[in-house]
Structure formats: C-alpha cells, structure tokens
Amino acid sequence: MKQTVRIMTLVTLGSLALATSAQKKVQTFQVSKVLPFTAEQVWAVVGEDYGRIAYSHPKIIESDYINGTLKAGEGAERVCYFNEKQTQFLKEKMIDYSPERMSFTNTVFQAGKFPVDPEYTRAVYLVRDLGNGTSEFSFDMKFRTKPAFMGAMAKGKFKRLINDYFIAVQHHIKTGENVTKENFKTIKKLYVNKEEDSDKSVVMVFNADR
C-alpha cells in the first residue's frame, strides 16, 4: 500500500513539474492600435465576420467556418490557410464571446505545419470605443512554439504580423477591398507613410513651440 502511495505521489509530482515547465515556455505579448473608425465598424470585421478573416489579413489566403458553424458566436470554429496547397493551416475556436464588450478569445485546436502548440496558444481580441469616431483594437496573445526554443524568435515575428493585421483591418474597413499577400506590400506603404508624416508634423510643432 505504501509503495502504491509513493508511486502515485511521484507520478503527480512529475506531472506538475512537466506542466510548470511547459508554462514557463509560454510566450506572451500585447499590441494595440487606435483606428479612425467606430468600435462597431471594427467589431463588424474582427468579431462578427470571424470566418472571413482572410479578407482583412495579410498572410491568410483563405478562411471559412467549419464543423457546422454558420456565423460568429460562442463555440464558432474556422480554418485559416496560409498557403495554396492548404497544408499550412490553423483551426481555431471562438470562446468567451461577448458582443457587448466587443471581445472574444481565439483558441487554436489544430495546427498544420505551423510551429505552435495548440494547447498553449490563444489570443484575446478586444475593441474599445474611444469616442469621436475612433476606437482601439487590442490583441493579447500567449503561445508556445514547437519546438519550444523557437518561442523567443517567433515572438517578434508574431508581433510584426499582428501590427500588419491592424493595417489590413484599417484598409479593409476604409475601402472595402480584400487584403491579400500580393497587394499588402503596396497597401502597407500607404498607411506607414501617413503615420510617419503625422509623427514628423508633431515633432515640427513641438520644435516650433520651443
């Protein structure tokens, strides 16, 4: 009996140690962007049009609802393809869906040729009304890569990708044009140049005041 208890204790401790080790390798980051649109306009694209993310994402070439899902909502599922052969993909599920707060958590339950561990990969989407026809779109992500040592390197790439996603969302809302891998380079220049010009104007005003 004592031997059995010892074995069970060791198994439990071992499981806890593995879980703790896995959690330590989880990477997190949070990015946000103020957009010149109402919160309702932004939410319509990132929340209500969940299955059509390919229309407003620079890397996803095709997306759709799966497993009987017909629209956004609690438990809605989608697939996102990142290459023409559809071998690189993410299957995702929407949970904690709150249209009142304009927020949801996006979980990954299957990854095809994509270096993330679905069990430890998820992101919280949140749209906040800032008034005057503007809103803030924030993206709070945690993930673990496979292999785990790639996490630190992948973190920077993921942050850049989400910042590009913000630009794609902005362009899609403004023009109605679908964003693709092919046209995003041109699209990005339009918005990055405008932001740089705006920053320069602020600096010029500041220097003039001095």
Regions found by a protein language model. Name each.
Residues M1-K25:
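Bacterial Sec-dependent N-terminal signal peptides
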Residues P36-E40, I95-S103, L126-E136:
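A short, structured loop/turn motif at beta-sheet edges
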Residues L18-N67, D197, S201, V205-R210:
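Hydrophobic ligand-binding cavity/cleft-lining segments
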Residues V31-K33, C80, F89-D96, Y120-D129:
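Hydrophobic/aromatic beta-strand elements that line small-molecule binding cavities or substrate pockets
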Residues Q110-D164:
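Beta-strand/loop substructures that line and gate deep hydrophobic ligand-binding cavities in soluble
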Residues D64-V116, H171-G176, N183-R210:
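Glycine-rich portal/gate segments that line the openings of hydrophobic small-molecule binding cavities
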Residues Y50, I162, F166-E177:
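Short amphipathic alpha-helical signal-transduction/dimerization elements
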Residues Q41-V46, I53, R78, M94, ...:
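Hydrophobic pocket/interface hotspot
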